[in-house]
Amino acid sequence: MESSWPAQSSFSYYNQGSMQTSSRHASSPTNEYSDRTPRRSAAQPQMPAFLPPPPPHGHQLTESGGDSLPSFSHSLYSPYHGPGGNLPSSNPHGMAHSMPSYSHISALSGTGSGFQYTNHSPMGLNEPLTSHSRSQITHSYHDPPRLPGYSSSPNLHQLSPVSPTAHLLPSMQPPSASPSSSSFPSSIPRTPATLPKGVKRHSLGSEQSFDSWDDEQEMSSGKVTGDRKHEKDSQPWGMPQEEYKKLNPKDKKQVRNRIGARRFRAKRKDYVNQLEAGIRLRDDEITNLQSQLESQRNEINELRLQLKLPLLPRGELSGLGLTMETQGQMERWENNDSMSR
């Protein structure tokens, strides 16, 4: 690489001497871009660390070596613009495109003035970029960021694994999800018509199983009424089952209501009879207790007569079964007690 350096330095820099020199012939691309290693800048300590100023506005370039470059119309230093401009069409040495180099400064002289400027091509090459390198750079700089809310984002499957729109019909899904349906992962389960079909089957089954529901009701009612002696298992509704099945739903409902009312009246009558029987038992018990109380009172009075004590008055029985005595009776009791002593 060292032997391929040009004998004369074909790189002009911005200094007073370069502005006073006459127009020089541009060296061939072979001598100009022979070395593309970072050692080029280290070998020339006089190379300035800054870029020369651009030419004045409206400055036109001359053709150098049969290559045409775009016009430079900026008033400031041009920033890095990615590949895409018109680049020369020759690569003499076939160097790699990604090797860093400071050799993109070329000696191009203007026609109207002696100002020289630098070639601001980002790569400093004379050959067009291949489709592979162009696509890499384009994607690295101009690829728009992907948002997680869009369906084209690769992180969409990290949201909810079961989306509320996954159970919708294809015609009910939002239009934004239809063009990018291929970007969804195949692992997400989709059952778009499960619920509607299930509901439809349920509704059809309910209509078709109306008679079976009646049969179940008949069987259950037959079990309940089988314990009763006044009803037969063969006719739980007061009629044969064949006749009951031939009736329309309205008549069946009337029959069921009539039988239900009849059962309710019978049950209520039984309950009332039980209550009346209990009342009769309580009345008999009260009568027996009253007779016992009267007999015991008579016995006490006989004993008091033997002791020459006043008889027990017949007091009115309270609701609690206690006797109520007046104040005069209490005084007589006290007097009798004092006299007996």
Swiss-Prot record:
Upregulation details from the record are:
Expression is induced by nutrient starvation. Expression under conditions of nutrient starvation is positively regulates by HOB1.
Write out the GO MF terms: DNA binding; DNA-binding transcription factor activity
Residue segments, region Basic motif? 250-269
- Which parts of the sequence belong to the bZIP domain? 250-308
- Keyword check for 4Fe-4S, yes or no: no
Question: SUPFAM superfamilies recorded for this chain?
Answer: Leucine zipper domain
Q: Where is the composition biased (Basic and acidic residues)?
A: 225-234, 242-254
Compartments it resides in: Nucleus; Cytoplasm
Q: Which family does it belong to?
A: Belongs to the bZIP family.
Cellular component aspect of the GO annotation: cytoplasm; nucleus
- For bias type Polar residues, the affected ranges are 1-32, 61-76, 128-139, 150-163
Gene ablation phenotype (knockout): Reduces LAC1 induction mediated by nutrient starvation and leads to greatly reduced melanin production.
CDD domains from the entry? bZIP_u1
Where are the stretches annotated Leucine-zipper?
A: 279-307
Q: Which GO terms describe its biological process?
A: melanin biosynthetic process
Write out the ranges of the annotated region (Disordered).
1-95, 118-254
What is the name of the gene encoding this protein?
BZP4
Organism domain of life? Eukaryota
User: Main role?
Assistant: Transcription factor that promotes the production of melanin, a pigment that serves as antioxidant, reactive oxygen species (ROS) scavenger and that protect fungal pathogens from radiation and host immune responses.
Q: Which Gene3D superfamilies match?
A: 1.20.5.170
Name of this protein = BZIP domain-containing transcription factor BZP4
Under the heading PANTHER family, the entry gives: BASIC-LEUCINE ZIPPER TRANSCRIPTION FACTOR E-RELATED, BASIC-LEUCINE ZIPPER TRANSCRIPTION FACTOR F-RELATED
Stretches of Low complexity bias are at: 178-192
Q: Which UniProt keywords apply?
A: Cytoplasm, DNA-binding, Melanin biosynthesis, Nucleus, Transcription, Transcription regulation
